């Protein structure tokens, strides 16, 4: 369903394009051998090149090139065998060279696509305009001293992939889905860790609005360096409504760069939006054009892992899962692997229900990650086995799972220790059934008179009297025979 904002003069739609800066996983920077470890002491991972010392020549890091190509292939994009690095000229204190080495009109990766997984199980394709490599800038720190700012150049020269979408997104929710899917692909490819809280994935959102039915692309504003998916969505929503208010009051939108204030939930003007000519792009004279062989690309392609879309299709075909469940499970590589371990040789639907239900809930409740879960895949699989062989009822299994989260013990151990084994002894179950029937003659008569839904109530009473240990199927069968004959 289309996302429409109702204004005073009519209905409006949002047009959104996203630029994502993804920090490349590499032990060294794009043009120097300095380390890239997050959280190091300020200015301890800086080479003369990163600090902009005169006469220092950049040397391309082949690993970063491989990572860019790998990402491009993961986005089903065209790999350009010849690309050019250009100088993007601007002054800022944390850019000691006085320019950023980037790529302009000849990027390493051309057009591609990304498939959004929609909440209703459907999909939508978003175009990728390009991916190019560039240096990150340093970091300005303004909150360490009341009257001074400090510069940390550890980040200066770190390799970034700027991934630019086409203006195909139409709602804050779609923007969130796009970022979630892109982060998933990058993590599967192991080209970026996607940790937005550490700044290794940052987003600029380009936002404009137009009347519903129009195909015109109106003036856009760019919201810079938003560092969480939720904030990106909030920023887009606010900015779109600001545009509509301006248009409906007879004004015009000025193309500009804006910042998002996450405390106030609003954007504010940062500077007028620069155009390409403002940066005086020209090919970097210290770097030859980057020429790669098709065999280099083919070698990387042959080593690509199974990506989320392919894994989702396989989960649907192999395990019989619906599109939504498969999409949730493959969103993170670790959750897909966890599910496959649990489901191996077992009822895949039951495995899916347990992983997406109780197990995911336990992660939220304990604050643990799937890499260090409160219940291992092996133990969850064993719990499913105990349900299947009749040792545990569904209700007892829930209790055992809670104990597994609490103690970390295997389900078989807990069943033995706590005497939680399901009662399948006919004599014991029959005694419990007889007791409930004899205590409720009025309800027995109602069942005989046709109110068969009450059989469920009788089952509940028997389960209660046996502390959930009776086999529900045996209880149901016995009640039906004894009451209805």
UniProtKB/Swiss-Prot annotation:
Domain of life: Bacteria
Protein EC: 6.3.5.-
Keywords carried by this UniProt record: ATP-binding, Ligase, Nucleotide-binding, Protein biosynthesis
First-tier enzyme category under EC: ligase
Transmembrane segments: none
Record's catalysed reaction(s): L-glutamyl-tRNA(Gln) + L-glutamine + ATP + H2O = L-glutaminyl-tRNA(Gln) + L-glutamate + ADP + phosphate + H(+); L-aspartyl-tRNA(Asn) + L-glutamine + ATP + H2O = L-asparaginyl-tRNA(Asn) + L-glutamate + ADP + phosphate + 2 H(+)
Any GO MF annotation of the entry: asparaginyl-tRNA synthase (glutamine-hydrolyzing) activity
Any one biological process term the GO annotation gives: glutaminyl-tRNAGln biosynthesis via transamidation
Family of the protein in this entry: Belongs to the GatB/GatE family. GatB subfamily.
PANTHER family assigned to the protein according to its UniProt record, in alphabetical order: GLUTAMYL-TRNA GLN AMIDOTRANSFERASE SUBUNIT B MITOCHONDRIAL AND PROKARYOTIC PET112-RELATED, GLUTAMYL-TRNA(GLN) AMIDOTRANSFERASE SUBUNIT B, MITOCHONDRIAL
Function: Allows the formation of correctly charged Asn-tRNA(Asn) or Gln-tRNA(Gln) through the transamidation of misacylated Asp-tRNA(Asn) or Glu-tRNA(Gln) in organisms which lack either or both of asparaginyl-tRNA or glutaminyl-tRNA synthetases. The reaction takes place in the presence of glutamine and ATP through an activated phospho-Asp-tRNA(Asn) or phospho-Glu-tRNA(Gln).
Subunit structure: Heterotrimer of A, B and C subunits.
NCBIfam families per record: gatB, PRK05477.1-2, PRK05477.1-4, PRK05477.1-5
UniProt name for this protein: Aspartyl/glutamyl-tRNA(Asn/Gln) amidotransferase subunit B
Organism: Paramagnetospirillum magneticum (strain ATCC 700264 / AMB-1)
Gene name of this polypeptide: gatB
């Amino acid at each position: 369903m289309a996302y429409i904002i109702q204004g005073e003069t009519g209905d409006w739609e949002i047009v959104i394009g996203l630029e994502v800066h993804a920090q490349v996983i590499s032990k060294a920077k794009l043009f120097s051998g300095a380390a890239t470890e997050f959280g190091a002491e300020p200015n301890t991972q800086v080479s003369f090149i990163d600090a902009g010392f005169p006469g220092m020549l950049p040397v391309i890091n082949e690993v970063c090139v491989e990572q860019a190509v790998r990402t491009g292939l993961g986005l089903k994009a065209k790999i350009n065998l010849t690309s050019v690095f250009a100088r993007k000229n601007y002054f800022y204190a944390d850019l000691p060279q006085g320019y950023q080495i980037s790529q302009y009109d000849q990027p390493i990766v051309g057009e591609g696509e990304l498939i959004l997984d929609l909440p209703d199980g459907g999909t939508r394709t978003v175009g990728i305009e390009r991916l190019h490599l560039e240096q990150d800038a340093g970091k300005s720190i303004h909150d360490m001293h009341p009257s001074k700012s400090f510069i940390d150049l550890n980040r200066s020269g770190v390799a970034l992939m700027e991934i630019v979408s086409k203006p195909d997104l139409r709602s804050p929710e779609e923007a969130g889905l796009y970022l979630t899917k892109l982060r998933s692909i990058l993590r599967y490819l192991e080209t970026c860790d996607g940790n937005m809280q550490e700044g290794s994935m940052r987003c600029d959102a380009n936002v404009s609005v137009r009347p519903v039915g129009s195909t015109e692309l109106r003036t856009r504003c760019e919201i810079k360096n938003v560092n969480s998916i939720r904030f990106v969505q909030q920023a887009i929503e606010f900015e779109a409504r600001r545009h509509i208010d301006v248009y409906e009051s007879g004004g015009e939108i000025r193309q500009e760069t804006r910042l998002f204030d996450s405390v106030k939930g609003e954007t504010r003007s940062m500077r007028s939006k620069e155009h390409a000519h403002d940066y005086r792009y020209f090919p970097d004279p210290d770097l030859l054009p980057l020429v790669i062989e098709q065999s280099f690309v083919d070698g990387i392609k042959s080593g690509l892992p199974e990506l989320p879309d392919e894994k989702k299709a396989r989960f649907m075909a192999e395990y019989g899962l619906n599109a939504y469940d498969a999409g949730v499970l493959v969103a993170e590589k670790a959750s897909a692997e966890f599910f496959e371990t649990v489901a191996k040789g077992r009822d895949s639907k039951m495995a899916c229900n347990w992983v997406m239900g109780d197990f995911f809930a336990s992660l939220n409740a304990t604050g643990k990650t799937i890499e260090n879960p409160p219940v291992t895949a092996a133990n969850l699989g064993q719990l499913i086995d105990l349900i299947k062989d009749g040792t545990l009822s569904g209700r007892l299994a829930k209790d055992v799972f809670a104990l597994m989260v609490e103690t970390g013990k295997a389900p078989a151990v807990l069943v033995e220790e706590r005497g939680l084994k399901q009662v399948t002894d006919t004599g014991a179950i029959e005694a419990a059934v007889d007791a409930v029937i004899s205590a409720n003659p009025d309800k027995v008569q109602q069942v005989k008179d046709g109110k068969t839904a009450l059989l469920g109530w009788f089952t509940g009473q028997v389960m209660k009297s046996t502390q959930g240990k009776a086999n529900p199927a045996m209880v149901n069968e016995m009640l039906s025979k004894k009451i209805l004959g």
